[in-house]
From Swiss-Prot:
Name of this protein: 1-deoxy-D-xylulose 5-phosphate reductoisomerase
Residue sites binding 1-deoxy-D-xylulose 5-phosphate per the record: 124, 150-151, 185, 208, 221, 226-227, 230
Keywords in alphabetical order: Isoprene biosynthesis, Manganese, Metal-binding, NADP, Oxidoreductase
Reactions it catalyzes: 2-C-methyl-D-erythritol 4-phosphate + NADP(+) = 1-deoxy-D-xylulose 5-phosphate + NADPH + H(+)
InterPro entries from the UniProt entry: DXP_reductoisomerase, DXP_reductoisomerase_C, DXP_reductoisomerase_N, DXPR_C, DXPR_C_sf, NAD(P)-bd_dom_sf
Classification via SUPFAM superfamilies: 1-deoxy-D-xylulose-5-phosphate reductoisomerase, C-terminal domain (SSF69055), Glyceraldehyde-3-phosphate dehydrogenase-like, C-terminal domain (SSF55347), NAD(P)-binding Rossmann-fold domains (SSF51735)
Highest taxon, organism lineage: Bacteria
Family: Belongs to the DXR family.
Positions with a binding annotation for NADPH: 10-13, 37, 123, 125, 214
Entry binding sites for Mn(2+): 149, 151, 230
Function noted in UniProt: Catalyzes the NADPH-dependent rearrangement and reduction of 1-deoxy-D-xylulose-5-phosphate (DXP) to 2-C-methyl-D-erythritol 4-phosphate (MEP).
Amino acid sequence: MQKMVILGATGSIGASTLSVIEQNPEAYKAFALVAHKSVDKMLDLCIKYNPSIAHMVDPQAAAELQRRLPAHMAIAVSSGEDELAAIVALPEVDCVMAAIVGAAGLPATLAAVKAGKRVLLANKESLVMSGRLFIDAMQGSNAKVLPVDSEHNAIFQCLPEPAQQAIGACDLAGAGISHILLTGSGGPFLTSDLDSLSQMTPDQACKHPNWSMGRKISVDSASMMNKGLEYIEARWLFNATKEQLKVVVHPQSVIHSMVQYKDGSVLAQMGNPDMRTPIAHCMAYPQRISAGVEPLDFFKVGQLSFLEPDFNRFPCLKLAIDACEQGQEATTVLNAANEVSVEAFLAGLIRFTDIARVNEYCLSHVEQRSLDTIEDILALDGLARRAAQERVAKL
């Protein structure tokens, strides 16, 4: 029985993870559930899954949860960053699902890595922000990091076994790999008139044609910033160069990514667009378990199409690729600016097309400095957020 900590238990990845646990109750136990402040959702999860620990980032939410839990349930309720770092490092913890959205997920994810845990990485921002520090921590602790994002999980499945065992230090060329082909659907605005993009609403941006996701990642998909963040994540996970990484627009989301080999072969991982598949793969690797997902019906798939990304339509993707080339400081600034600009768009404060403008402004105006510690990263993250907030206020 593997005991799991689920960071971001009340989110979409958390729900999918718990669904896979339900499919395999003899093998997995939700040992600790972690959320920000969604007390109602956490209460329901506690009653259903009876974890040993329920942790709320927000202290007031933790106090409310403690009051509302049935008296007969022996669930320890906690709050605070230090307490969370201690939870993921507990000796009885076998596996940590890192699914807290955004920069907020970095400290706990890094704590799990430093504790040498098996970490299922769904928080791409951890690598986007901390890059080399994250990889060094992983290698220094012998933590096993497995990628949950459907694209990176697909790439991982298409790699030869020695490369799978060398996450963060892969020798792609030595493994006979010429390119990693990172696929993305293009989101809901792939064929929209360019002049109409400035008028798109948050609800329109969140109507992804294939995937069911949270609102922040849905907007990132609409702008293809999500693919840009995944590009940066792939650079670190697979030790890839700019020449080895390519983005391919694939509207059907059937092929989740591909690996191209020097002999002309291309290996692709395919499946229905359901996050339970990569989650189950990571939970059981190198074995396979039931995910509760219907198998792909090739007779219903129909046409598969592929396009080059249009940077006029998706300027955020270009910003991310360029930031990745510039280095860790630029990707940290970009991630922070994007979180602020997307939040502002969802709140109705700026237009959809302003997201890229705010991000570009911060990349060119925030003073970048060397990032040697997690404190350096969080300080630069704070600077970029303030710059983005000031820019949003002027739009």
